[in-house]
Regions:
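Class I SAM-dependent transferase core
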Residues: 1-81, 85, 89-93, 97, ...
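Conserved nucleotide-cofactor-binding alpha/beta core module
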Residues: 73-193
Length: 231
């Protein structure tokens, strides 16, 4: 079966599973998931499965991407904050719906790979950066929409504070060893209305930035009568 046929099969499965927003389905149809899948898993690009990527992270299951995107309601929105760029697939789907996507990722390696994919796909409305997702992106706040693609143990006040009036935050909450729930929070008149959208399973949202690997020490070698040299 060709990739195109597999994509059609996946879209039909998403419709059967409750994804009814035509804008979301169109965005998923327009984004080539194979561009975000590691080579060993290319034959599974359009299976409804989560797939491993670098740094112990995952490329989310298409059903989960569609479900979160539908819950977010990003079509026609001016800007969206995404916490957790990962492979960039969710980012790319969002870029087909809103005018600009600001995306924060703690791993420099992942953001570099994602940026190369964005350039290859000519996604010029994506603004990625390396940063601590727990802090959001206060310089660009407030945001009418925020989506978090890793699970904090509870809702982060720093992200809620960056929601615009009437804004929506979609976030999986809970510890990995316990039950996680997908939540949708809507800010109305300085209060937050919370809805539970069902169980999910995500990698944890980790605070802070990873330490850079130390540079290897220079090797000192004896070079004979002329003395010592650094390799």
């Amino acid at each position: 079966m060709t990739l195109a046929a597999r994509k059609i099969r996946l879209l039909m499965e998403l419709r059967r599973n409750g994804i009814t927003d035509t804008a979301v389905l169109r965005a998923i149809e327009q984004v080539p998931r194979e561009a975000f899948v590691p080579a060993p898993f290319m034959d599974q690009a359009y299976e409804n499965l989560a797939l491993p990527i670098e740094r112990g992270q995952t490329l989310s299951q298409p059903q989960v991407v569609a479900r979160m995107t539908q819950a977010l309601g990003a079509a026609g929105v001016g800007k969206v904050l995404e916490v957790g760029t990962g492979s960039g697939y969710q980012t790319a789907v969002l870029s087909r719906l809103c005018r600009r996507v600001y995306s924060v990722e703690r791993y420099r390696e992942l953001i570099g790979d994602a940026e190369r994919r964005f350039r290859a796909l000519r996604l010029h409305n994506v603004v990625p950066k390396v940063g601590d997702g727990w802090n959001g992106w206060p310089e660009q706040a407030p945001f009418p929409r925020i989506i978090v693609t890793a699970a904090p143990p509870d809702v982060q006040g720093s992200l809620v504070d960056q929601l615009a009036e009437g804004g929506v935050l979609v976030v999986p909450v809970g510890r990995r060893s316990r039950r996680q729930e997908l939540l949708r929070l809507t800010r109305k008149n300085d209060t937050v209305v919370e809805e539970t959208l069902g169980p999910v399973r995500f990698v944890p949202l980790i605070s802070g930035l990873p330490e850079e690997a130390p540079k290897p020490a220079a090797t000192i070698r004896y070079s004979g009568p002329t003395g010592w040299s650094l390799a």
